[in-house]
């Protein structure tokens, strides 16, 4: 490594080169998160429910976490989304239009004991899933 009064350019050049070894730098500069993200960088997205699935919780927990398989409207990509709340899966039917958002795991990944699920359902046919579970609102018949 050069050091001296006139070594600035060399130092800058070598920093620029070695910075590409940093995974986070590379992902940020090349916009890799946005390119691989099914939501394409948006906070929420609409989709159509394809099927209901039960995903088994990771060790040491046991139980079946109720999730839905969704096809996004804007790009046709498929993803799994968790249905939060007691009996929430009963308010979601196939071919319903749902709104999904990130589940809130660290670094945009899955949360807790639900493997491979990075999103959660927040609305069903334009009505908040939380309100449906609480019984404050009823699901409209389309």
From Swiss-Prot:
Signal peptide: none annotated. The keyword Cell division does not apply. One of its GO terms (cellular component) is small ribosomal subunit. GO terms for molecular function: rRNA binding; structural constituent of ribosome. It comes from the Archaea. InterPro entries: NA-bd_OB-fold, Ribosomal_uS12, Ribosomal_uS12_arc, Ribosomal_uS12_euk/arc. Transmembrane segments: none annotated. Keywords: Ribonucleoprotein, Ribosomal protein, RNA-binding, rRNA-binding. GO terms for biological process: translation. HAMAP family: Ribosomal_uS12_A. With S4 and S5 plays an important role in translational accuracy. Located at the interface of the 30S and 50S subunits. Part of the 30S ribosomal subunit. This is Small ribosomal subunit protein uS12. It comes from Picrophilus torridus (strain ATCC 700027 / DSM 9790 / JCM 10055 / NBRC 100828 / KAW 2/3). The lineage of its organism: Archaea, Methanobacteriati, Thermoplasmatota, Thermoplasmata, Thermoplasmatales.
């Amino acid at each position: 490594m050069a050091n001296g009064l006139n070594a600035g350019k060399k130092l800058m050049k070598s920093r620029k080169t070695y910075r590409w070894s940093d995974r986070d730098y590379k992902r940020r500069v090349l916009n890799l998160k946005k390119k691989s993200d099914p939501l394409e960088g948006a906070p929420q997205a609409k989709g159509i429910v394809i099927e209901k699935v039960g995903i088994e919780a990771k060790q040491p927990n046991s139980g079946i976490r109720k999730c839905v398989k969704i096809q996004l409207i804007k790009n046709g990509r498929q993803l799994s989304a968790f249905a939060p709340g007691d009996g929430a899966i009963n308010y979601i039917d196939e071919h319903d239009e749902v709104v999904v958002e990130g589940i809130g795991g660290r670094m945009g990944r899955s949360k807790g004991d639900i493997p491979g699920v990075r999103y959660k359902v927040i609305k069903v046919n334009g009505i908040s899933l939380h309100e449906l579970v609480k019984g404050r609102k009823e699901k409209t018949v389309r």
